[in-house]
Amino acid sequence: MASGHGTYLQVGAFANPDAAELLRSKLSGMVSAPVFISSIVRNQQTLHRVRLGPIASAGEVQQAQNSVRLANLGQPSVVTSDQ
Protein backbone atom coordinates (compact mmCIF):
# COMPACT_ATOMS: atom_id res chain seq x y z
CA MET A 1 0.00 0.00 0.00
CA ALA A 2 1.23 3.51 -0.76
CA SER A 3 1.92 5.90 2.06
CA GLY A 4 2.62 9.56 2.52
CA HIS A 5 0.88 12.68 1.40
CA GLY A 6 -0.15 13.68 -2.06
CA THR A 7 -2.77 13.49 -4.72
CA TYR A 8 -4.20 10.14 -5.77
CA LEU A 9 -6.81 8.98 -8.22
CA GLN A 10 -9.35 6.44 -7.07
CA VAL A 11 -10.51 4.46 -10.09
CA GLY A 12 -12.80 1.95 -8.41
CA ALA A 13 -13.95 0.33 -5.17
CA PHE A 14 -14.98 -3.31 -5.06
CA ALA A 15 -16.33 -5.79 -2.53
CA ASN A 16 -14.68 -8.52 -4.61
CA PRO A 17 -10.88 -8.45 -4.21
CA ASP A 18 -10.43 -10.28 -7.53
CA ALA A 19 -12.22 -7.47 -9.38
CA ALA A 20 -9.96 -4.92 -7.69
CA GLU A 21 -6.86 -6.91 -8.63
CA LEU A 22 -8.00 -7.19 -12.25
CA LEU A 23 -8.41 -3.42 -12.51
CA ARG A 24 -5.08 -2.83 -10.75
CA SER A 25 -3.38 -5.11 -13.25
CA LYS A 26 -4.94 -3.33 -16.25
CA LEU A 27 -4.00 0.10 -14.90
CA SER A 28 -0.42 -0.91 -14.09
CA GLY A 29 0.27 -1.46 -17.76
CA MET A 30 -1.01 1.92 -18.89
CA VAL A 31 -0.03 4.59 -16.36
CA SER A 32 3.34 5.64 -14.99
CA ALA A 33 2.09 6.30 -11.44
CA PRO A 34 2.13 3.46 -8.91
CA VAL A 35 -1.15 1.52 -8.78
CA PHE A 36 -2.24 -0.09 -5.51
CA ILE A 37 -5.21 -1.50 -3.64
CA SER A 38 -6.25 0.09 -0.35
CA SER A 39 -8.74 -1.98 1.64
CA ILE A 40 -11.10 -0.43 4.20
CA VAL A 41 -14.14 -1.57 6.15
CA ARG A 42 -17.31 0.46 5.70
CA ASN A 43 -20.71 -0.56 7.07
CA GLN A 44 -19.30 -3.98 8.02
CA GLN A 45 -18.18 -4.61 4.43
CA THR A 46 -14.63 -4.61 3.14
CA LEU A 47 -14.06 -2.37 0.14
CA HIS A 48 -10.97 -2.76 -2.00
CA ARG A 49 -10.16 0.66 -3.47
CA VAL A 50 -8.02 0.80 -6.60
CA ARG A 51 -5.88 3.92 -6.56
CA LEU A 52 -2.93 5.40 -8.37
CA GLY A 53 -0.40 7.84 -7.07
CA PRO A 54 0.95 9.84 -5.52
CA ILE A 55 0.82 12.14 -8.53
CA ALA A 56 3.03 15.21 -8.38
CA SER A 57 1.36 17.75 -10.66
CA ALA A 58 -2.09 18.80 -11.81
CA GLY A 59 -1.04 18.09 -15.39
CA GLU A 60 -0.14 14.52 -14.53
CA VAL A 61 -3.47 14.09 -12.70
CA GLN A 62 -5.34 15.26 -15.80
CA GLN A 63 -3.28 13.01 -18.07
CA ALA A 64 -3.90 9.95 -15.87
CA GLN A 65 -7.65 10.71 -15.67
CA ASN A 66 -7.83 10.99 -19.45
CA SER A 67 -5.92 7.72 -19.96
CA VAL A 68 -8.27 5.84 -17.63
CA ARG A 69 -11.38 7.30 -19.28
CA LEU A 70 -10.15 6.62 -22.82
CA ALA A 71 -9.51 2.99 -21.88
CA ASN A 72 -13.09 2.74 -20.53
CA LEU A 73 -11.79 1.73 -17.11
CA GLY A 74 -13.87 4.16 -15.08
CA GLN A 75 -14.25 7.77 -14.01
CA PRO A 76 -11.37 8.38 -11.59
CA SER A 77 -11.88 10.68 -8.62
CA VAL A 78 -9.16 12.83 -7.08
CA VAL A 79 -8.53 11.91 -3.43
CA THR A 80 -5.88 12.64 -0.82
CA SER A 81 -3.92 9.98 1.01
CA ASP A 82 -6.11 10.12 4.13
CA GLN A 83 -9.48 9.58 2.40
Where in this protein do the model-derived segments appear?
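Extracytoplasmic
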Residues: 15-83
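Long, low-complexity, acidic/serine-threonine-proline-glutamine-glycine-rich intrinsically disordered tracts
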Residues: 1-7
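Conserved short N-terminal element of RNA/RNP-binding modules in eukaryotic RBPs
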Residues: 9-13
